[in-house]
Each structure stands twice: as C-alpha cells, then as structure tokens.
Design a protein with these regions (language model features):
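Juxtamembrane extracytosolic/periplasmic "stalk" immediately C-terminal to the first targeting helix
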Residues: 49-55, 214, 238, 391-396
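Membrane-embedded transmembrane helical bundles of large multi-pass transporters/channels
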Residues: 1-44, 143-388
Length: 493
C-alpha cells in the first residue's frame, strides 16, 4: 500500500545516506567555509528601537528628530573636577567626533567669562551641581545606531575618567560589548555541560562529541544563511546557538537509540541498521519538529518585529538541525564506528522500569498532584512583576551604569525625554506649558529654547547656530528630566 511504499522510499534514502557517508562529510565540511564567511559578514543590528512599529508616537518623534534636526540619540555627559577652560577643551574634543551632531553646555548660550550665577536659576541648576557640570551630546544616528555607539566608544577614549557618559545609548553600547564578549563563553559552557551529561547518560563517551559536531555544523549553517536577510539582531545572535542546541539535541539522541535497536535486528549490517534508523528518525522527528517550527513562526505575528527576526532564524535552525541529524550525524557514526565502540561503557543511569511502572499504575496520584500544583502556578503567573528596564540586570560596574547612578545622585535625573512641540507656539504659551510640566510629580526639569535664553532676550538676536540646535521651521525641541527610573511604571505614568 501507499504507506508501505513511502516507508520503503524513506528506508532507501537512509541506506543511500549510509552508503555515501564519506561524500556527505566532505560536502558538509566544505559548506562550513562559505557559512563561516557569511556568518562573519552578516550585519548585527544593535538598534532595538528599529523593531518597533513605525506608526507609534515614539518612532514618529524619532523620525522627526532625524529629518528636522539631524539628531537621533543623545547622552548626558557629567564632568567632575574640571575648570571651565578644561570643560571647553573637552567639549571641543567631543564635537570633533564622527556622528556627534551637537554638544550643548552653558557656553552654548553664554560666554564662559560670564559667571554661572547670573544665568537663569533653572538653567544654572540644569548645567551644574555642587561638584560637577553637565553637557548634553546629540548624535546624528539613532539611539542604538552603529554610528551612535561608535561615537560613545570614542568619547570614552578622549574624555578620560573625569567624564561620565550616561543615557540609553551608553547602556546599549555596554550591552553590545558585553554580548560580544560573553556569548562565546556561555556557548562553550553549554557545550561542556551538555557533553558531560550525555557522556554519563549515554553508553559511549565519544558519541556526545559527534552529537555536538553535527549540531554545531547546523548552527554555523544557520548563522551563515542569515546573510540572506541582510542583518539579524544582537539578541537573536546571542540566543540562536544555545536555543538550537537545546531544541535539536533530542533528534540526535533518538537517532542513536534507533540505530542501536536496529543493530540488534540486523547484526553485522551497520549500513542497513543505520538506513532503518534514519527512516525511523524521519518518521518520528518530522512531526515534533513541525510543531516546534510552527511555534517559532508564530513569533512572526508580533507587532514588535524582533519576533520575526528571532522566529525565522530559529525555525530555520530547527529545519537545518533535522537535516543535519539524518545526514551528517549518521555519516559521523558510521565513519567513526570503531572509535565509538572502543569508548563504550556500562550505562550509569539505572533502569527506570520500576518507576515507569509505578507511574502507570498510580497515574491518579500524579494527575491529582499536577492539578493541585496548578493553583499556585496560576497565582504566581498572574502576580509576578515584569521589568522593561534594560539596564536593571547589568553589572553595576559598567561605565554606563556608574554614569547613570552619578547622574541620579548629582542631578536627580534618572531618565530624560525629548518632546517635540510646534515651533509656532508663542513663548508665553511654551513657558506656561513647561511650568505645568515641572509641576508634575517626578519631573525634575523641563527646558526649551525659551528657558535657555531667558524671557529678556529676543529670539531674533540668538545666533542661528544656537537656535538650530533646539528649533527648526516646524518643530521645537524640549527636554524633560525625571527622577523616576527609565521604563518604570512611575515614569510611564
């Protein structure tokens, strides 16, 4: 019948794999070369905001900032223990860095020979605390754009230890560096731990090595083929290898156990045993892998398009993992069969027949236990807190975290926002709006062009180079500081 014919064709395919194992290994090794090159040249996107829907207010505001002001991200730079002249020199160094659009300090508004004390009080408080002064640095790239992060790195190099660069751009720069530095380390740790567990639970010390090699090759193929997407996010890059290892390991274990069973059916004919093992694996694994792939592809329907990025890459990884499991792994096992046999050992894990028999006989106990445990599980699921602050779990000694803490301590400024208002608003209305904002609980300051220059100075006499920083033909830029932490419920309210 049709089912028997189809199974026969799958067995033939398995036997063909077993027969041509050397060719398959050679081709799979050669494919690592372009995959490795593509993996190294695939652009990694660290701009997490680029995955947000384009029609939300935040993204619209960022687009206006770029189009009308030539600005994207910004950072607060706190300077300690410098004279005014030294601050001016530092400011000039920062202004000379690529992707720095503007640097605003109090000398942008007034000459440094003018005592700071004669400045408007709110302007003085914004730029100064007891022991330090503050500069605002605007970048011509997005908050987490490549250009912005490169500028952050160079700013750290030229400013020295007396300058503390805070803000989301600095945090994302540190996250990028941390991810690049540690991703290889935790992949190695995962491989070592999984290999140790497999070496103990399997009946050969060597077979875990071939599991890891075949899965590792599939991971490289997966990361290499990402080149066809143009770029992937740094989160996808960091998660892919470990996720793919965990998701596809079961396929390899199933193939190995099926091969052992078929060796008993066909003693002395390893190729035939492997052919049937491949057939059994395809029949069993395809169904489970399809549900896994569907689960990852479901992420593609998220409005936050990072889900598309991660979902497609992981679905592709599962497909490549299945292909590797029924082609590369069998070729490894048959080619190195003698070495595997020499490293065989008695199974360390005892037989679970008594336990499985008890579970079957007393199934009602386990059903009852799971129903009872479901109640606290549902309660916990609906009552735990979710955090959205990216820097809350980062090491406290990172440059950006230290800078953010100092900014909070010295200036009572835990987060900063940009507000775009119509440039045609009258100064009186703008100042009234800013005063209303400052009266909102948690707002530490609200500054626009009018508050920077003061009500006594006509806007017409302000140099265009100064005015263009905060005002365009259509919009004016207002900075709002908050004493609440970024992404907290309080600041969102």
């Amino acid at each position: 019948d049709y089912r028997s014919e189809r199974r026969g064709n799958v067995v033939k395919f398995g036997k063909w794999i077993a027969k041509h194992r050397i060719i398959i290994l050679v081709i799979s090794v050669l494919l690592l070369i372009p995959s490795g090159i593509f993996m190294a040249t695939t652009r990694i996107n660290y701009d997490i905001l680029s995955y947000l829907p384009k029609d939300i207010e935040t993204m619209k505001g960022q687009d206006i900032l770029m189009e009308d002001f030539g600005k994207g991200g910004f950072s607060m730079v706190m300077v300690e223990g410098m004279t005014d002249k030294e601050v001016v020199e530092t400011k000039k160094k920062i202004e000379a860095i690529d992707h720095v659009a503007d640097v605003v300090w109090y000398d942008t508004i007034a000459d440094i020979s003018l005592p700071k004390e004669v400045l408007p009080e709110n302007l003085y408080d914004f730029f100064n605390s007891e022991n330090s002064t503050l500069m605002v640095v605007f970048f011509d790239d997005a908050t987490s754009g490549d250009g912005t992060m490169a500028a952050i790195e160079e700013m750290r190099a030229v400013t020295g230890k007396q300058c503390f660069i805070s803000g989301m751009s600095a945090v994302l720069t540190d996250m990028k560096n941390l991810s690049d530095k540690e991703s290889v380390m935790y992949i190695v740790i995962a491989v070592i731990l999984v290999s140790l567990v497999l070496a103990v639970t399997m009946d050969s010390f060597l077979i875990p090595l071939f599991f890891m090699l075949s899965i590792g090759m599939a991971i490289i193929y997966n990361l290499g083929t990402n080149m066809f997407f143009g770029e992937i996010s740094f989160i996808t890059k960091a998660l892919t290898a470990v996720l793919q290892l965990g998701v596809t390991m079961d396929f390899s274990i199933f193939l190995w156990h099926s091969y052992q069973e078929n060796q008993l059916r066909f003693p002395g004919d390893k190729e035939r045993a492997m052919g049937h093992a491949i057939s059994n694996t395809i029949s069993s694994v395809v169904g489970s892998s399809v549900t896994t792939i569907a689960g990852f592809l479901a992420m593609c329907f998220m409005s936050f398009t990072l889900g598309i990025d991660l979902g497609i890459v992981m679905a592709k990884g599962v497909v490549l993992g299945v292909i590797s499991c029924v082609t590369i792994l069998p070729s490894f096992i048959l080619t190195f069969d003698r070495a595997i046999e020499k490293t065989r050992h008695k199974e360390i894990i005892p037989s679970m027949k008594k336990l499985s028999s008890f579970i079957v006989r007393k199934s009602w106990i386990f059903i009852t236990a799971f129903v009872v445990l479901l109640i606290p599980a549902i309660y916990g699921y609906t009552h735990y807190d979710v955090y959205y602050n990216l820097d809350s779990t980062l090491p406290k000694d990172l440059d950006s975290i230290v800078a953010n803490s100092k900014l909070t301590d010295e200036f009572n400024m835990s987060s900063t926002h940009m507000l775009l208002a119509d440039s045609k608003m009258k100064s009186k209305d703008v100042n009234m709006m800013l005063k209303d904002m400052e009266n909102v609980e948690g707002v530490s300051f609200a500054l626009g062009l009018d508050t920077l220059i003061g009500p006594a100075i006509p806007e017409e006499i302000i140099p265009e180079s100064v005015k263009s920083i905060l005002k365009s033909d259509k919009w004016q830029l207002i900075m709002i500081g908050s004493e609440y932490m970024t992404a907290s419920d309080e600041v969102n309210a």
